[in-house]
Amino acid sequence: MKLVLIPGVILCGADVAQAVDDKNMYMHFFEEMTVYAPVPVPVNGNTHYTSESIERLPTGNGNISDLLRTNPAVRMDSTQSTSLNQGDIRPEKISIHGASPYQNAYLIDGISATNNLNPANESDASSATNISGMSQGYYLDVSLLDNVTLYDSFVPVEFGRFNGGVIDAKIKRFNADDSKVKLGYRTTRSDWLTSHIDENNKSAFNQGSSGSTYYSPDFKKNFYTLSFNQELADNFGVTAGLSRRQSDITRADYVSNDGIVAGRAQYKNVIDTALSKFTWFASDRYTHDLTLKYTGSSRDYNTSTFPQSDREMGNKSYGLAWDMDTQLAWAKLRTTVGWDHISDYTRHDHDIWYTELSCTYGDITGRCTRGGLGHISQAVDNYTFKTRLDWQKFAVGNVSHQPYFGAEYIYSDAWTERHNQSESYVINAAGKKTNHTIYLKGKGRLGIDNYTLYMADRISWRNVSLMPGVRYDYDNYLSNHNISPLFMTEWDIFANQTSMITAGYNRYYGGNILDMGLRDIRNSWTESVSGNKTLTRYQDLKTPYNDELAMGLQQK
């Protein structure tokens, strides 16, 4: 059960000046002023960040997580970004009203951009069966976006498959009156920072080893952006944006059990973004958008206590979407078709992971674990068709109605692959292999159909509005029929939108995590030479859901 209380108070004040007109009469006017403040949380449970507010707010590494950091509904992972790992540029996990970070829904122009491959696991540790992932399918650079909307309560029925909240990012449309090219560059580095490190962590931090996190005592960050807006013909134009965010981190290559450092190496963390939207205003009734999007990230890691454990981990996402807005005489119809490819991978430099009692690495000898576990990856292709019909407002007696209806179909084609055979074992005192496991080369697929229907209506009488709605979801993975009711009421006390009370009840069903099925496939490629292999099967699972009771008060 999620209980949400949303207060909202907006107070404005200014010095009053007086002026004298030709008739010697005094009149009051407010001097011109500009107010800079964090974006408030409106009473209806959503926060809208325009491109202007995105430019004003501090966005750190340029991720959506950084943009939402100051929102009172959002809580950041306190262990992910600390003074110990300032060189990291990956998006941070966010929790909305205390829900799991991997149960948020991310969208780009209304199409799902959620990575449901393995969003609950962001570990950078070596693994033969578990691939690190994140709930954000695209690592967007917010400086290239037109706006971002966070829905944290009273979420409309058109959004589903989440327990926490919804983050909807919009890519810029071209503006015929504002053709321009924009270049940007930012940089920061460890030499410009002063970090206060706990005495228990200071030695490991200065070495640049991997302890509770991947320490980054020596780093350089560089951020490059290029964007342009251009009209190509009458009522037809394009916007595009490119960015590279890069962090170069110097860490220890290997640290022995007694703290001896055997060399240092530079590890690179890169996020590339490319976004483009072609827009055609065909007529007063028809508007077409063609959107292309790409983000790619890669990060180099090693485990400083394991020699020769270098590996590259990353994410690549790309897709396209076509939108058509149709203005009918009695309604507005929006149709969207899209395809998105989202993938995660881990590529080790070595294919054998083993522990031996006596090994030599440089000038260091003793017990050690070394090597890697080969190359594994997983990906999903999402094919989306969705449509929404917004009826024009009409009245029945003294009561007005503004209904809308929608449907969505997503086919998810997921696959996982181990690109080469790898193995792990322990060499005992007698020089024999124990705990020997072989991970076979292989590839497997998993296909899921997702169906959605929804409808809602805004019913208004005088200064009171009711918004009932219902959403239906079904997929052939868990085969659950999920019905989500929505009810919201709004009272505009003085009928001038200065004092408003909102209350409601909603149910939100979470999304599927494909890793459950993909891990079944990967586990089937595992052979235990010195024991029985373990297999896990998932069946008869229910879809998790949250019930929300919310009340909000807003005073302007």
What is each stretch, according to the model?
Residues V380-T384, N398-S412, K441-K556:
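Structural signature of Gram-negative outer-membrane beta-barrels, strongest in the C-terminal barrel
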Residues L275-R299, D310-L478:
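Face-selective signature of the C-terminal outer-membrane beta-barrel domain
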Residues S179-K182, T213-S298, N315-L328, K332:
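Transmembrane beta-barrel wall of Gram-negative outer-membrane proteins
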Residues S135-Y138, D146-V155, G165-S227, I260-Y267:
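Short strand-turn segments of transmembrane beta-barrel domains in outer membranes
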